[in-house]
Structure formats: structure tokens, C-alpha cells
Design a protein with these regions (language model features):
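Conserved beta-loop-beta/alpha segment of the NTase-like Rossmann-fold superfamily
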Residues: 97-99, 107-112, 117-171
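N-terminal glycine-rich phosphate-binding loop and ensuing alpha1 helix
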Residues: 3-4, 8-112
Length: 171
């Protein structure tokens, strides 16, 4: 598989035709979300919290605004385009990303008892449960290219590439 089989969303680069890269056909591709960097430009914030978990204000499904981690907004946007197979490349100190995408039924039950169950969290968990999520470990921060190559070793065929620290606003 050569570079022509990789669609890079974060830079809107595509080696495929415009029709193949349209949102209507994205469901055919798995998505590789790179989150292995150490976030030196965001220190001291990124020392303890992964930059991909930075809170942003994003539209929810009902067009209301909601505070959510950047990587969640990216996941939901790809999910909305039909993607159901996700590969996350994570590095040291990125356990918060894996935890965030691991549904916690006990936490939802706790919130229900307090009558504070946010529908958006239930919606996120439903999306996660209807998707395939795989976490790949980048043992040392060797850059974006290394993260893409790690994905290439396990993903068969063409795949989408999205950096977890770059958000593209959809229409």
C-alpha cells in the first residue's frame, strides 16, 4: 500500500478523486486518529492533560453548544460521516483518551441516581458501542509519520488520517 491509499483529512489532502473523498463515501474507510505527540507547545497545560483532551465548545446533535474534549468532537464528526472503525495512535501519558472512550456504566448509574444524566454522554456511549475502537501504542514520540506507519501495519486497505489536535469545522 502506497501513500496514494491514505486520505489525510486534517490537511484536506486526498490522493483519491473528490467523489471518493466526499462525506457520503467515508463509511467505507477506517479512520486513524493520531494522538501520540507530547504537546510541548501547550506546556505546562499538556504536562498532565493530553492536548487532545482540551475542552472546546462544539455543536451537539441538536445544534446546542456543549463543552467536550477536542478528540471527542473529532470522533463524533467522523462518526456522523459514517465512519465506524477507529484506530487511535496514543503515546505515553494518553491514558485519559482511552478512558474517555471506554463507556462507564457505573458512572451513568451514579448520575441517574442524582438525576443528572447528561443525554450527550449517553449518546457518546451509544456511538462508541456501535463502533470498533482500537488503540495503538506509540512507544516513543517519533512524529506524525511514525504514527501513520503504525496504523498502516494493522489497517488493511485505504484509510483516513486525522490528527487528534486538529479540528475541521463541518458545514
Amino acid at each position: 500500500m502506497g501513500v496514494e491509499n491514505i486520505i489525510i483529512l486534517s490537511n484536506r489532502i486526498s490522493k483519491r478523486s473528490a467523489d471518493e473523498a466526499s462525506p457520503a463515501s467515508l463509511e467505507a474507510y477506517p479512520a486513524l486518529i493520531t494522538a501520540g505527540g507530547i504537546g510541548t507547545r501547550l506546556l505546562p497545560f499538556s504536562k498532565e492533560i493530553p492536548k487532545e483532551m482540551l475542552p472546546i465548545i462544539a455543536h451537539d446533535g441538536d445544534d446546542s453548544l456543549q463543552l467536550k474534549p477536542l478528540v471527542q468532537a473529532i470522533f463524533e464528526q467522523l462518526y456522523g460521516a459514517g465512519v465506524r472503525n477507529f484506530y487511535f495512535v496514543v503515546g505515553r501519558g494518553k491514558r485519559a483518551i482511552e478512558d474517555h472512550f471506554s463507556p462507564d456504566s457505573g458512572f451513568l448509574e451514579f448520575l441517574e441516581k442524582k438525576a443528572k444524566r447528561p443525554a450527550s454522554l449517553s449518546d457518546l456511549y451509544a456511538k462508541i458501542r456501535s463502533s470498533n475502537l482500537v488503540f495503538l501504542n506509540q512507544t516513543e514520540p517519533l512524529g506524525f509519520g511514525d504514527a501513520v506507519l503504525r496504523g498502516r501495519t494493522v489497517i488493511k486497505g485505504p484509510f483516513l488520517v486525522q490528527a487528534a489536535d486538529t479540528f475541521i469545522l463541518s458545514k
